[in-house]
Regions:
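N-terminal activation segment of mature serine protease catalytic domains
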Residues: 28-77, 117-119, 141, 257-262
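Catalytic-histidine neighborhood of serine endopeptidases
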Residues: 68-115
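Bacterial N-terminal signal peptides that target proteins for export
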Residues: 2-15
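Short, well-ordered loop/turn sites that connect or cap secondary structure elements
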Residues: 67-68, 86, 140, 218
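Active-site region of chymotrypsin-like
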Residues: 40-57, 124-133, 162-260
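N-terminal signal peptide c-region/cleavage motif recognized by signal peptidases
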Residues: 24-26
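Active-site substrate-binding loop(s) of clan PA
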Residues: 35-36, 83, 109-111, 125-160
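Beta-strand/loop subdomains of soluble extracytoplasmic proteins
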Residues: 88-93, 99-108, 144-147, 161-185
Length: 263
């Protein structure tokens, strides 16, 4: 056998060996996802507003997930911006039980707002639900396999949580959109002064309804962030018709800070 043939054969054997060694790891991560979905699904809720004069009465706004004692819910601050006490508009959270017809509706109230990081903490009534495990601060790593759960298209397809997979493509500094002149107040000015902070950039497609949903590690299920926004190619409507495939999440460390401040 020629020297070149021997070298090629050796290289091929090395490749097969590496593939065989790597295969169990990939299979393990994939096999874990169905169990994680079953575990996390009961803790993910739809967030919206209820008003007697509206049609439909429940207006979906985003996603949230249960933390701490089982009656607290984390979501994005922009998801609950429209709460209007004058018009008797109430915040409601909907707990999907796998069938939108059997969804459990809970009334909720704001416990704490962190507009600087676009986070909100709600307390909902009724019996507690399973709380999700929160990861360690600064726990996200580039290349980490992740998944997120929520209601990407709202109630259009029924209020059943949907799961998407992806990876952490970067830890990057992003500034939240600046308020308009009409929205300027003490908090808004404080947010501008704070400027940008680190976001988790995802190689995955999120949709408007995913806002406020949990981003979790694909192996452990621990929440490492809160889905926040999508990079748009054009108008807001293009998020559905021409998704960019780039999404962002707020690191869990700001959720931990918010929970500590609310105590």
């Amino acid at each position: 056998m020629k020297l070149l043939d021997v070298m090629l054969l050796h290289a091929w054997k090395c490749f097969i060996g590496v593939f065989i060694l790597a295969a169990p790891f990939v299979a393990s991560a994939s096999d874990a996802l169905p169990d994680l979905i079953a575990r996390i699904k009961p803790s993910v809720m739809a967030v919206g507003f209820y008003q007697e004069t509206q049609n439909p009465r429940f207006g979906f706004r985003g996603t949230g997930f249960v933390v701490a004692g089982g009656n607290l819910l984390v979501t994005n601050a922009h998801v609950i911006e429209r709460s209007d006490d004058v018009n008797r508009e109430s915040i409601l959270v909907v707990h999907s039980k796998g069938d939108s017809a059997q969804a459990g509706i809970r009334r909720a109230a704001v416990v704490h707002l962190d507009k600087a990081h676009d986070l909100a903490l709600l307390r909902f009534d009724g019996s507690p639900l399973p709380a999700l495990e929160l990861g360690k601060p600064a726990g996200a790593r580039e290349g980490q396999l992740v998944a997120f759960m929520g209601f990407p298209l709202g109630s259009a397809l029924g209020l059943t949580p949907v799961t998407h997979r992806g990876s952490v493509s970067a830890i990057t500094s992003v500034a939240l959109p600046s308020p308009t002149a009409r929205q300027l107040d003490a908090r808004a000015i404080s947010r501008i002064k704070e400027g940008s902070f680190d976001f988790i950039q995802l190689d995955a497609t999120a949709y408007p309804g995913n806002s406020g949903g949990p981003l979790f590690d694909l192996e452990t299920g621990a929440v490492i962030g809160v889905v926040n926004m999508v990079a748009l190619k054009g108008t807001r409507e293009s998020a559905l018709s021409h998704p960019s495939g780039i999404s962002y999440a707020i690191p869990v460390e700001f959720v931990l800070r918010m929970l500590a401040a609310a105590r």
